[in-house]
Amino acid sequence: MNEPMTVILASRNAGKIRELGELLSTYDIHVLGLDSFPGIGDIEETGRTFEENALLKAQTVTQLTGHICIADDSGLEVDALDGAPGIHSARYADDWHSLDGESRDERNMRKLLSVLSKLPDAPRSARFVCCMAAVKPDFLEGRDLVVRGTWEGSILD
């Protein structure tokens, strides 16, 4: 009997790792997260697009582990802000002070609504973008894969 293939998810989010593990277990694929590799620190996202950041993370982890890696990058693009916050979504309001008990997500939303309130006639169209990359070690045949999905919507007050 063959051992299951191991795939690394470039994340420390236990929920994401568990969910992907459940999906891929049907195919005899074992999923590990970055916590299984304590020598891998945070990977700096230096890309200019969601695709570049996802690919950068997957390539880095594959080089360090020798395993196939899946990585993602995601965020919000607001048309009235020329696509901002974009790849900076998670850190959008890091330059704003936190209110008592306010989470980073809440602070990001507060900043976004404040910026949009100064543009009362601007459209509120926006989209959530998620890009995923799968990278294989050099010794495996096939090409790396990058995909992009979007969910269109509007920003409400």
Could you tell me what each predicted segment is?
Residues 2-8, 14-33, 38-157:
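Anionic-ligand binding patches
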